[in-house]
């Protein structure tokens, strides 16, 4: 299990609670060569990929509806992104797929101009992201304040939880019961069974129960078309001229910025969760390449998905590229050969798994009375504004930008006082 440790440094003495790995963890366990030579590690990484793939399905389908595209196409784009970033990405075990924040950016363009503009917009966004990485601009991430990071994590936990409410808030005792049973299985089974991830046990057992009992419940299949087979490559249906450029460039810039911001913030968070480092430059280049390939399948582009990344890293104990590669392969099999079986998974079960992810994502330490009392008021205000802006807009990038802007607008005198308080707290230690 993960240990929760309050991490205080001279630069950031307050608002951070870090989930650290147990002492027995070897830093070499995140290397592919080590994993493939160890049956135990290979099984662990593969099972982590299985539950991650299952956790991706409902969100990707929901986000495709927001963007106005076929769910099957978005799922295939997620397969492409997951496989591509497992090889080219700069952060091991970080899951990348078609994401909600990107869907929110693409949706207005699709509704106004049509789906034919998705491909050129995504291709342009991918090129921008590659240039961002080549030019080394990912290093600007170090200027994001810790209070904004804390707000980002807390807002994300809230957004993940709120997204699950429609799937378990029901007058049907069976739906509520499945949700509660999922919570109990995921929380209690690891005490007795450690070889198999508890979310996978919950999905298998409760899906078998609903199918064999003949109960009619909302399932994954109700969220969108799950026809079998592979979709073909998307053809460019619009001319490459100035009119097309005028339509796609605002969307492409937004996709590139939002995707990079969320991916790099997630990479930074996973760095802390696993006490390892990542290459932000490589992640930027890999994300751009992945989005270009995903766009060729008509996908809505994507970025790192922190909820599913936490499923992989914490629930599945995934640490290497093997886990995300396995997630992509399992998702490919589910979408093509086993789409009918996958469609029978109850949404209440997946909602239970993601609700626990939301609870584990939220930084509860940041709201403890002792933390609020000792933390500089400016940091608390910035954190709360970041949360409020993110939850109200449903866009993590806007929330982070709002927090950064508020921090930048703080009077110089208040900034000096904030710095002095941090220095004093460090000396007291």
Regions found by a protein language model. Give the residues of each.
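Core transmembrane helix bundle of multi-pass membrane transport proteins
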Residues: 18-49, 55, 106-107, 113-274, ...
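Interfacial segments of multi-pass membrane proteins
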Residues: 106-111, 309-322, 329-336
């Amino acid at each position: 299990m993960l240990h929760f440790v309050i991490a205080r440094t001279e630069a950031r003495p307050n608002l951070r609670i870090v989930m650290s790995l147990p002492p027995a963890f070897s830093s070499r366990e995140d290397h592919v060569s080590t994993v493939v030579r160890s049956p135990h590690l290979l099984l662990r990484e593969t099972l982590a990929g299985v539950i991650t793939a299952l956790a991706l399905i409902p969100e990707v389908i929901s986000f495709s509806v927001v963007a106005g595209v076929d769910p099957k196409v978005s799922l295939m784009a997620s397969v492409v992104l997951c496989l591509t970033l497992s090889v080219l990405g700069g952060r091991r075990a970080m899951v990348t797929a078609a994401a909600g924040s990107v869907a929110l950016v693409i949706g207005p363009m699709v509704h106004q101009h049509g789906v034919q503009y998705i491909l050129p917009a995504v291709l342009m966004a991918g090129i921008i992201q590659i240039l961002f990485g080549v030019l080394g601009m990912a290093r600007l991430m170090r200027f994001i304040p810790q209070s904004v990071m804390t707000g980002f994590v807390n807002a994300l936990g809230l957004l993940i939880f709120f997204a699950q409410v429609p799937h378990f808030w029901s007058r049907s005792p069976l739906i509520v019961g499945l949700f509660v049973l999922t919570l109990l299985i995921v929380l209690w089974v690891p005490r007795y069974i450690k070889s198999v991830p508890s979310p996978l046990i919950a999905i298998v057992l409760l899906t078998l129960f609903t199918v064999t009992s003949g109960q009619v419940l909302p399932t994954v299949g109700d969220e969108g078309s799950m026809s079998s087979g592979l979709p073909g490559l998307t053809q460019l249906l619009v001319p490459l001229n100035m009119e097309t450029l005028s339509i796609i460039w605002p969307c492409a810039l937004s996709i590139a910025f939002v995707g990079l911001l969320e991916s790099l913030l997630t990479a930074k968070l996973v760095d802390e969760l696993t006490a390892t480092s990542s290459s932000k430059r490589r992640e930027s280049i890999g994300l751009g390449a992945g989005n270009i390939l995903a766009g060729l399948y008509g996908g809505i582009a994507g970025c790192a998905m922190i909820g599913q990344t936490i499923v992989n890293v914490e629930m599945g104990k995934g640490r290497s590229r093997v886990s995300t590669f396995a997630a992509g392969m399992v998702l490919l099999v589910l979408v093509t050969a086993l789409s009918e079986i996958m469609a029978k998974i109850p949404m209440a079960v997946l909602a239970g798994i993601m609700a626990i992810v939301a609870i584990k994502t939220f930084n509860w330490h940041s709201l403890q009375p002792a933390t609020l009392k000792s933390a500089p008021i400016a940091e608390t205000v910035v954190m709360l504004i970041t949360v409020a802006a993110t939850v109200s807009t449903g866009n993590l990038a806007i929330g982070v930008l709002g927090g950064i802007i508020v921090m930048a607008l703080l009077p110089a005198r208040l900034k000096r006082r904030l710095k002095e308080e941090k220095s004093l707290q460090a000396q007291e230690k």
